[in-house]
From Swiss-Prot:
This is DNA polymerase IV. It holds the Pfam family IMS. SUPFAM superfamilies: DNA/RNA polymerases, Lesion bypass DNA polymerase (Y-family), little finger domain. The gene is dinB. It comes from Staphylococcus aureus (strain MRSA252). It is an enzyme of class 2 (transferase). Belongs to the DNA polymerase type-Y family. GO terms for molecular function: damaged DNA binding; DNA-directed DNA polymerase activity; magnesium ion binding. Residues 6-187 form the UmuC domain. Its EC number is 2.7.7.7.
Length: 356
């Protein structure tokens, strides 16, 4: 049986990072997302600069203001967060259909079928983080391991903008020295019960019998017993059927030079064709999307009689669609190429890996 390879991606201070990306004046400042300082709400996310003052998620805004009176208090913009999250989830699904989103800013990916001797899980995680950075200008942290519990644990160990791999060589040492409050799923109430029963770290938890833990925590006790041993058999649950494959890029500065834009269209067509090839799919629709410098989103789609899967075919159609969309007087900040109406390909484009 092939050993599983699971990645857990967790965006860094997601809401605050989106706000700083969309308003560069906030970069490097103590940003607190949730509402006005005088509001009765709670903190959704705080930047790392704000966390230095003791501000954290779920804290009352009034308390956050007392701790960080010079902070930049921002009202949540869920439209922007959802749009960015959709971009990120699309990146995940360009690698695998086995994606389990846990929230707007985190997900598990089962990439077992993608791993090869020359393409370890850690390298795939690096590619995913690179794609997120290039397409959204946001950083993400990743955890890589052989089950979901350890992957999630790993993703929080080297934040922000970091990656940690937990495998059979280091799992025991990591778990034994881990503070009990750092175990995923152990909240304040559970932590207090653990402390009251002499459990302060992973080793203390490991030394408890399964019976003792069930007595203390009921059914959860069996899960805690397994976690202390790095055991988790839960699957990455994905009910989504892939309907499209696509890639988009945000330019560093607004662009209205056709040559530069079409170079990017060629690049995106190639990446899209590569992903279709991995899935052994072809497509009967091609869509080009642009976002103008004024953040207006425009798109145009073409339905095809015969399906396409090659870089050249996708580019030729995308070229026509872009020419229909473009306005020489309006610079753009983003362009995307997506193919849809997927069907099983009768011909698999060959890559170098097919000959190895």
């Amino acid at each position: 049986m092939t050993e599983r390879r699971i990645i857990h991606i967790d965006m860094d201070y997601f809401f605050a990072q989106v706000e700083m990306r969309d308003n560069p004046k906030l970069k490097g400042k103590p940003v607190i997302v949730g509402g006005k300082a005088s509001s009765r709400g709670v903190v959704s996310t705080a930047s790392y600069e704000a966390r230095k003052y003791g501000v954290h998620s779920a804290m009352p805004m009034s308390q956050a203001h007392k701790l960080c009176p010079n902070g930049y208090f921002v009202t949540s913009n869920f439209g922007a967060y959802r749009e960015t999250s959709a971009q990120i989830m699309s990146i995940f699904r360009s690698y695998t259909d086995k994606v389990e989103p846990m929230s707007l800013d985190e997900a598990y990916l089962d990439i077992t079928e993608l791993v090869r001797p020359d393409l370890p899980a850690s390298k795939i995680a690096q590619y995913i983080r690179k794609d997120i950075l290039e397409q959204t200008h946001l950083t993400a942290s990743a955890g890589v391991s052989y089950n979901k519990f350890l992957a999630k644990l790993a993703s929080g160990m080297n934040k922000p903008d970091g990656m940690t791999v937990i495998d059979y060589r280091n799992v025991h040492d990591i778990l034994m020295t881990l503070d009990i409050g750092d175990f995923p799923g152990v909240g304040k109430a559970s932590k207090k019960v653990m402390h009251d029963n002499g459990i302060f770290n992973g080793r203390d938890l490991y030394e408890k019998t399964e019976f003792e833990l069930i007595r203390l925590f009921g059914k959860r006790g069996r899960g805690l017993y397994n976690k202390a041993r790095g055991i988790d058999h839960s699957e990455v649950k994905s009910t989504r059927v892939r309907k499209s494959v696509g890639t988009e890029r945000t330019f560093a500065t607004d662009v209205n030079d056709d040559e530069e834009i079409l170079r990017k269209v060629w690049e995106l067509s190639g990446k899209t064709a590569e992903r279709l090839n991995k899935l052994q799919k072809s497509a009967k629709t091609v869509t080009v999307k642009i976002k103008t410098y004024q953040f207006e989103t425009l798109s145009k789609q073409m339905s095809l009689r015969d399906s396409v899967s090659s870089e050249e075919d996708i580019y030729n159609i995308a070229y026509l669609l872009y020419n229909d969309l473009k306005d020489p007087d309006v610079p753009i900040r983003l362009i995307g190429v997506t193919v849809g109406n997927l069907e099983q390909s009768t011909y698999k484009n060959m890559t170098i890996y097919d000959f190895i």
